[in-house]
């Protein structure tokens, strides 16, 4: 965001100036007091363990210019303060007003989808970063706090703002898109996720496609397999995937073929995507990037800058064993993609540690059973199951010839897994974040090094 006075920020946020100099400069916004810097607006919100107002003075000591808080909370800190009926809502109001003022100077790319949002954002940011000043979310900042913070913390010189729009319930993406005012948008994937709020696949489709209604122009991208479901409106969109406007196929090892039908050309790029979901993310990222960078040579130079976010197909090699951590989140589509990758691997044995996929609604038992059955059909040699969905997963996985072992807790699980592992194994960890498989994998890695030595 460009520098603005505290008075203007208060007006844009529909807040009132309680204390402080209205002419003081506001350069950014933070919700974590430890990230405060000179000129920052510290937004004091209720957190999981405490209220941000408890850390307002700490933010001010680090240079924060003012605090945005709920009514009456100004008495609980010493510095400049503005109050709004709801600080959380004021944060979104402020970000929306800033975007309205700056949209002509800063393009905004909105990314949503059931799988790969954060990874696609990271890819877009990395590739664009070689030629444009881009700003992307620092993590999965995709809710009513993360999206506005990403907007407000962008440097004034930002040319392309990359935003991740998430959802749990109908209408949330529309609200975030209205605030973000995107010039470009991409739906990475539509599959069974957040069914507790979105109910079914059609609910997911409607919610994701709602983002594209807020984009003027042609830069509305979606997976081609949904083209028929849109009917006559399909001509309003661009499509990724087989026979779509942009398609990316695996080619020789370490490269992909880009079929850019929109511009009537084909070219190779140096990229090894790994599982199918990462290939889809790369395809989605390219769909957006090609509107800014058309030269394949320039793309080839930028691709090595791509860094996949933590716990997304994160590979650790220890003691001759490959540990693959893809446990930031999980869904039927994402799990299938990782199982297929594991099945194609050349490791001596294929091992999967899988746990509950959350927010799958009333049919969650069937989704887990089907995932277990896919483990069986993919000929995974050894399957460990854990969490609330363990029974359903085990039932499906037991339809094959592989061994299935139930894990009761992480401590027991480390011992059970380490007793089975052999040099040359590849071990996939996949579950929703609440299962804590990242911690199990970390403890397993430590034990392997202690007992077998680093190799």
How should these model regions be labeled?
Residues 178, 413-420:
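Short amphipathic alpha-helix with an adjacent loop that forms part of the alpha/beta core around
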Residues 10, 90-221, 229-233, 290, ...:
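Phosphate-binding loop of NTP-binding sites
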Residues 47-49, 308-311, 328-402, 452-455:
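Active-site beta-alpha connecting loops in nucleotide-dependent enzymes
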Residues 1-93, 97, 344-345, 374, ...:
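N-terminal leader/targeting and accessory segments in enzymes
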Residues 111, 310-314, 434-442:
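ATP-dependent carboxylate/acyl-activation modules
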